[in-house]
Design a protein with these regions (language model features):
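C-terminal motif of bacterial Sec signal peptides marking the signal peptidase cleavage site
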Residues: 17-20
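Solvent-exposed, non-transmembrane regions of membrane-associated and secreted proteins
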Residues: 22-128, 137, 149-209
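Short, charged beta-turn/beta-strand-edge "cap" motif at the junction between a beta-strand
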Residues: 138-142
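N-terminal export and membrane-targeting signals
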Residues: 1-13
Length: 209
């Protein structure tokens, strides 16, 4: 298991990031995001990453709507940014792998943007326990997950740091974004929203288009 510092989740006005120690080439000491922030404008570009495993996520479907999902990594300062296109999501390459059987698969995205409007991650606020999501992976498979828990924590609240960072324990799809009322800088949104979903069965082959 990789050694990882804790994550602190903070909503801020100008950008979205998961921050932590800088990425290293050693997977046992890879960087771990320290925070998540959600923004309204002036979004810097993400750090593109390469998903070496074909089982990496390529899209996520929620309520019949699909968001392309890009691998993203931390930069030298430890910042992890979702795609600037708010219709897309970012899968943190240092989190768990779909179908791996353990750990948290961390997916994040922008709630909105002043120019683009609502982002795909805004849909996370409408998710309810029992809802189903589909993660399609690069090996041509679709993995189904069922939402089993929702959590919204104020910026001053206690965050589920162990659950966000873990690579062991039950496999969990963890969607992370900001929520609640937009309160302006420096906090941005009032809350941090989490959607926890568990696998419902084995992967299925994705039909050819």
């Amino acid at each position: 298991m990789r050694a990882r510092p804790s994550i602190t989740v903070v909503c801020a006005a100008a950008l979205v990031f998961l921050g932590g120690c800088a990425t290293t080439s050693d997977p046992d000491t890879a960087s771990v995001p320290a925070s998540v922030t959600e923004g309204k404008k002036d979004m810097p570009p993400p750090v593109a990453a390469i998903a070496d495993d074909p089982a990496a996520p390529v899209s996520l479907t929620l309520d019949g709507v699909t968001a392309p999902t890009d691998p993203v990594a931390t930069d030298a300062s430890g910042t992890l940014l979702p795609p600037q296109d708010v219709s897309r999501l970012g899968w943190w390459v240092d989190s768990a792998m779909p179908g791996g059987g353990s750990g948290a698969i961390v997916v994040t995205g922008h709630v909105d943007d002043v120019d683009q409007g609502d982002g795909f991650a805004a849909r996370f606020a409408d998710v309810r326990e029992g809802d189903e999501l589909t993660v399609s992976t690069g090996d041509g498979r679709a993995r189904e997950y069922r939402v089993d828990r929702l959590l919204s924590v104020g910026n001053e609240g206690n965050l589920p740091l162990d659950e966000i960072n873990r690579l062991d324990g039950p496999e969990t799809l963890l969607l992370v974004t900001c929520g609640g009322e937009f309160v302006g800088p420096p906090l941005g949104y009032a809350n941090n929203d989490f959607v926890f979903a568990v696998p419902t069965g084995p992967a299925a082959e994705v039909p050819a288009p």
